[in-house]
Amino acid sequence: MLTINAVIRKDQGKGASRRLRLANKFPAIVYGGTKAPVAIELDHDIVLNTQTKEGFYTDVLALVIDGKESKVKVQAVQRHSFKPKLTHIDFVRA
């Protein structure tokens, strides 16, 4: 099972997302189940390398958010139109 580390986002909105992307991170969200949605930030290079591995899009992943592990699946991925960059990922709780 693939494991990805994440941090809960403190700031939200367009400006905060742009600052994240300039810091080589990007926003994501975890939703589904009975819990409330959680806005998180991920390290771009780590996720970019992880997404090339088999099973990233189809298997259940372990997402560690501030020390707490959640089982999630990738629901949607947004990419930059011509650069090899991820801009946002939606995770759904498994």
UniProtKB/Swiss-Prot annotation:
GO annotations of cellular component type: cytosolic large ribosomal subunit
Record GO biological process: translation
Source species, domain of life: Bacteria
SS bonds (residue pairs): none
UniProt GO MF annotations: 5S rRNA binding; structural constituent of ribosome
Keyword terms of this UniProt record: Ribonucleoprotein, Ribosomal protein, RNA-binding, rRNA-binding
Family: Belongs to the bacterial ribosomal protein bL25 family.
NCBIfam families: PRK05943.1
Subunit structure, interactors included: Part of the 50S ribosomal subunit; part of the 5S rRNA/L5/L18/L25 subcomplex. Contacts the 5S rRNA. Binds to the 5S rRNA independently of L5 and L18.
Free-text function comment from the UniProt entry: This is one of the proteins that binds to the 5S RNA in the ribosome where it forms part of the central protuberance.
Name the UniProt record assigns to this protein: Large ribosomal subunit protein bL25
